[in-house]
Amino acid sequence: MKEYRVYLERARSRQQDFLYPLIFREYIYGLAYSHNFNRSIFVENGGYDNKYSLLNVKRLITRMYQQNHLIISANDSNKNPFWGYNKNLYSQIISEGFAIVVEIPFFLQLSSSLEEAEIIKSYKNVRSIHSVFPFLEDKFTYLNYVSDIRIPYPIHLEILVQILRYWVKDVPFFHLLRLFLYHFCNWNCFIPTKKSISTFSKSNPRLFLFLYNFYVCEYESIFLFLRNKSYHLRLKSFSVFFERIFFYAKREHLVEVFSKDFSYTLPFFKDPNIHYVRYQGKCILASKNVPFLMNKWKYYFIHLWQCFFDVWSQPRTININQLSEHSFQLLGYFSNVRLNRSVVRSQMLQNTFLIEIVSKKLDIIVPIIPLIRSLAKAKFCNVLGHPISKPVWADSSDFDIIERFLRICRNLSHYYNGSSKKKSLYRIKYILRLSCIKTLACKHKSTVRTFLKRSGSEEFLEEFFTEEEEILSLIFPRDSFTLHRFHRNRIWYLDILFSNDLVNDE
């Protein structure tokens, strides 16, 4: 990311922190091209030797300012193949340019905030998906109620642009961004549909994720502000917090509104044990106190989304459940708090007492049914979990087939090694192992029994079960009791930055 700092310093020396001139700089598109964000979008089929042209991008931006930018004469089309109708291709080119330009200043703010907080070395571990589970193990065993909330959408992109204006002061840049969204992404309708959002997110994934994250960051900043105002203890876990234009004015307005209209209700929101976790398009709100406080926070969220972001959310879609009686889905796992009861005999002088001790433990379980559904969708088994062959891979060599199955098995084992019960994970491994055997038997045009006799059933494909033990034996002492104990306990890996489709099938 050193290129970001160089390009922003170059732009500062010319245009006083404005982002608009960066749209017309060739190194911006070269940066997107070299990082392989989407290499195919910079390639035109005719006459460009697999290279993009900044001149064509500038011409397209110029035509965006014209009312008849889609009316292209036949002469222009004959002279230059660029002006043939290929709306999606060049909208993606400009979308990459927008995403790169607008990410530059915020990445620098993020890196400076991390350096000031002295957590730059552990930032990669914090980014890991598995980093949230140790937090849940430490905190959720002391909580009683949980609310699983789906962040509402669709939201009109005009609102996202207005949110972005709180951070950046470049008016021409936002004017061009609005033109791009309205002319190329079909955002002329007043209420966007889920289909239009899905189309835009697939054709412009980087820009869409950036704008969506701004929407989430905005409502979370307000939520954190309300949470801090409702209790005298300051929140210290959010050390990375950006300064925004007009934020203090907005905050003073919120203080005035809540002190005027909610002076008697705010003391009831003093809940020091409320915890908030966001993942993908959902968030979890957990608390130790009575459901009354959770219900108040639920309506806080609903009114915040409806009044501040014009996003409709139904109160009945947010349920409040007891942790001991409810399982919630989190990043491909089923999680709940289990009550462990034990009886201890205590003796005092001549009297003996039986004391019942109740302890809580967070259970994180592999969701076997969604995983089997994902394997069936990928044609590794049927809907009942019976392994089937993969004839599409039959043209590959035996080594490639085994390596493909091992890679899938290794990734699933790596991701689900934090499960408290490994039986479901072993079942998934067994399905993949038999599917691999059936695929090889199908390739060699023989039955499974004949193929196993020929290759040796005792030693064939033992890597499906022995690879994990070999890795653990390199990390921990070669003691059978130690390895058995680590098989029973959870192991979280802090190098997992994303989940694949098999994990994320909800």
From Swiss-Prot:
Keywords: Chloroplast, mRNA processing, Plastid, RNA-binding, tRNA processing. It is found in: Plastid, Chloroplast. The keyword Transferase does not apply. GO terms for biological process: mRNA processing; RNA splicing; tRNA processing. GO terms for cellular component: chloroplast. InterPro entries: Domain_X, Maturase_MatK, Maturase_MatK_N. One of its GO terms (molecular function) is RNA binding. It holds the Pfam family Intron_maturas2. Usually encoded in the trnK tRNA gene intron. Probably assists in splicing its own and other chloroplast group II introns. HAMAP family: MatK. Belongs to the intron maturase 2 family. MatK subfamily. This is Maturase K. It comes from Trifolium beckwithii (Beckwith's clover).
